[in-house]
Amino acid sequence: MQENFFDKLLDLGKEWSIERVEFDEQINEIDIYVRFNLDTYKEKSGDTYHGVYDYREYRRWRHLDILQYKCFIKAKIPRLIAQDGKIYSLDVPWADLGSRHTFLFERFAIDVLLATKNQTKTSQLLRCGFNVINHIIHAASERGVLRRDKSILYKQLSVDEKSHKANHQYVTVPKLPRYGKYNRYC
């Protein structure tokens, strides 16, 4: 019953299902263990499936809180054999490669950051470290730059020098005046 509830709540697709849910009352955390459904993956892959090499150790991703408890998704990621015999890790549908946070957590962190306009306050509200929020900002910025139309990115560019508290430390601020947007990747 409990696993069905989380299956519907997380909506991870048919290739992944909830194995079990553990609650640690001492540290107020919920771990949702997710299992890879190999048979479903085989059906979907057809001729491109060449076997599972092994499974990585459990990885843990921070997810949106459930009530007042921190929530984490834990899963063993399968390493598959490619057609050419090389081994690769399967991408998970809830997070980017190498990320320790789910897409939903990152999106919520950005929403909170836009509301607070303060990284420290955002990290306090989400009960995570300042570095976590900083990493999420940089990852979101990089994804945004990749989605931009490259043909309009450099048609017109303004550059401004800003000093910090009159102590002669300057920051160069590139801006796209036509769109009113700052561009940190010039």
Task: Describe the role of every protein-language-model region.
Residues 32, 43-46, 82, 109, ...:
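Mobile genetic element proteins and their domesticated derivatives, centered on retroelements
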Residues 32, 102-117:
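Short, amphipathic alpha-helical "recognition" segments used to contact nucleic acids or chromatin
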Residues 41-43, 91-92, 121, 167, ...:
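Short helix/loop capping segments that flank catalytic or ligand/cofactor-binding pockets
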Residues 86-107:
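Short, Lys/Arg-enriched anionic-surface-contact patches
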Residues 120-136:
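Short, basic interhelical loop/turn and adjoining N-cap
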Residues 135-186:
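RNase H-like nuclease fold core
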